[in-house]
Amino acid sequence: RSRQRLLSAEGETQARTVGQVFQRHRLGVDEVLASPFARCHDFAQIAFGRVQDDRQLLGLLSQDSGRQQRIDHSLALLRRAVVAERNRVVVGHSSNIQQTTGVFLPEGGAVLVRPDTKAERGFSVLGELRPADWAALAQAA
């Protein structure tokens, strides 16, 4: 932890806002998975009150021997069905998101996907949320 970039005060505020959006809109959450990096783990913990660290969600910036395995794991998560009326939350790194979905997000953003066996990749991208979108959703009734 001491050598990692920690979640900033702005990141903590964003995490609380994300949690408020899920509560206010009664969005059910099944799993909360996160990269074990401190900022990812802490974001998930603050937003959802629980988190399961998943080493396979480490970033993809290096060309190490486990890179393809991490890509495959992320793709499997996106393809795997969730419990009805529930969501799987994955807090990770932009490199993973870009590699698996083709979407580039700023920190604090989200890509919404749905498993879809008819889609070429086995999932469909439904949309994106930018950091400012979370604040607007938190205010909406």
Put a short name on every predicted segment.
Residues R1-R55, L60-D64, V103-A132, L137-A141:
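Active-site-proximal alpha-helix that buttresses catalytic centers in soluble enzyme cores
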Residues V18-V21, S74-L78, Q98:
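A generic local structural motif
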Residues L33-A34, R86-G92, N96:
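Beta-strand elements within well-structured catalytic alpha/beta cores of enzymes
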Residues L57-R67, I71-R79:
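All-alpha RGS (Regulator of G-protein Signaling) helical domain and cognate RGS-like helical scaffolds
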Residues I71-A84, W134-A141:
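A polyampholytic, Gly/Pro-enriched intrinsically disordered region
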Residues R80-R86, P115-A119:
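A short, structured loop/turn motif at beta-sheet edges
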Residues S94-Q98, D116-T117:
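Short, flexible beta-strand-to-coil junctions
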